[in-house]
A protein has these predicted regions:
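Short acidic-glycine motifs
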Residues: 1-418
Length: 418
């Protein structure tokens, strides 16, 4: 990692990460490796009653050698990882009785009927009448709320919360292949191809909502041709191309839950590739049930980069001069669909006593009646991108008058066009 004093050929960064891939040799060599981590080998966290689930295995191999001795070599490497990591969710949830509209349990606030809202005869503002026995009649319960209640876990702890300990899975595979060809003693060519595949499954805080996949696929191809024109004059041409796409799916993506629940207004405005996923529900005082707002899912990130560079290095006396330029074409394309299938917020404002709100109203009572405080929907989903071409020309001279001092002259010119 270079954080300062790097060459003029590098720019537009606070630091440079230099990475190299090994080339093959005249001898055939190979390596196998495996790195294992497991909760059975770990100590318990100080604040946890038990050890968290962890199963992580990194493994791979490299092999390299000659294709034609002294002329053509190859090197290949593979690395894989399989990980299962435990997570802990402890949700504040309503009781099964509350999901049926029964708020008569101990410690619950008084629930007022919003249909009885009327002017306060003895003052300003409005008043309401409580539901008899603090129970909402079944005929008043929202069909949409009753549909989504199936995804809300019941309390399973002595404190009245719903504890859930799923594991998050992560599978990765990486492959790199490189070839080196010595055309002559003064002309050398190499090419490298790298492939990366990432597959992750993220669990929701509510187990019935399931898991959402995160997928990453990337390819990188690089090639270089180096010529030693004279013992002190070296010419290098490089080309690189990078393609990559990241896909984050929503929870239950592909299932039209709004239509199943009877929520209208979404079927006519679907967006290809993101049809159906779980909406977002937020209740004051309870754990939210988030889906699309989790990492702004569903979304995609698509990138394409081409880069060509041409450099000439000249060594004369105590001078090491380098001149050249590069051109880079960059085309990003992003989509995200946060709140695309709806974001409903319930605060208890519809079931409180407007004349004296303290100790009255409940956000889940508002939910049971189908009366949100706010409803949001982002439409159409965000789509943004474009393309640009970046040009850079530079000159760089390292001059060493003594062993202790190294002046550096680095003029350069950059052009960026969108």
């Amino acid at each position: 990692m270079q954080q300062n004093a790097y060459s003029a050929e590098f720019s537009r960064a606070g630091g440079m990460l230099n990475a190299t891939t090994k080339s093959g040799t005249n001898d055939l060599h190979g390596v196998l490796f495996d790195f294992l981590r497991n909760d059975k080998l770990d100590a318990r966290s100080f604040f946890s009653p038990r050890r968290e689930i962890l199963k992580r295995n990194q493994f791979g191999a490299t092999v390299g050698g000659p294709v034609i001795r002294n002329r053509f070599f190859f090197m290949a490497s593979y690395e894989g990882m399989r990980e299962r990591q435990g997570l802990v969710f402890n949700n504040i949830v309503p009781t099964a009785a509350m999901k049926r509209g029964d708020f008569s349990g101990p410690g619950l606030p008084i629930i007022y009927d919003p249909l009885t809202t009327r002017p306060n005869p003895s003052g300003t503002g409005t008043i309401r009448t409580p539901f008899p026995n603090n129970i909402i009649p079944e005929s008043r319960l929202s069909a949409q709320a009753r549909f989504f209640n199936q995804f809300i876990a019941d309390p399973n702890t002595s404190s009245g919360t719903a504890a859930f300990a799923p594991s998050r899975s992560l599978d990765q595979d990486q492959l790199t292949v490189r070839g080196d060809w010595n055309l002559t003693n003064n002309h050398k060519f190499f090419a490298r191809w790298s492939w990366h595949d990432n597959r992750q499954q993220d669990p929701n805080a509510y187990p019935a909502v399931g898991r959402a996949p995160l997928k990453t696929h990337a390819h990188n191809l690089g090639a270089s041709f180096t010529s030693t024109l004279r013992p002190n004059l070296i010419h290098e041409v490089r080309y690189n191309v990078l393609t990559g796409i990241i896909t984050l799916e929503g929870f239950m993506q592909g299932r039209d839950l709004n239509t199943e629940a009877g929520i209208k207004g979404f079927t006519e405005t679907r967006r290809p590739g993101t049809d159906g996923s779980f909406p977002d529900f937020l209740w004051s005082g309870y754990s939210a049930m988030r889906s699309s707002s989790f990492d702004q899912r569903p979304k995609t990130q698509d990138r394409l980069v081409h880069e060509f560079s041409d450099n000439l290095t000249w060594i004369r006396g105590r001078h090491i001069a380098k001149f050249g330029g590069k051109v880079r074409y960059y085309r990003p394309y992003f989509t995200d669909s946060k709140q695309y299938v709806g974001d409903w917020s319930f605060t208890g404002i519809n079931t409180e006593n407007p004349a004296s709100p303290t100790g009255t109203g409940n956000s889940f009572a508002d939910w049971a009646l189908g009366l949100p405080a706010t409803v949001l929907r982002a439409f159409p989903g965000n789509t943004f991108g474009g393309s640009g071409t970046y040009w850079q020309f530079f000159g760089h001279d390292d001059f060493n008058p003594t062993f202790a001092v190294e002046p550096r002259i680095s003029p350069k010119r950059k052009i960026f066009r969108c």
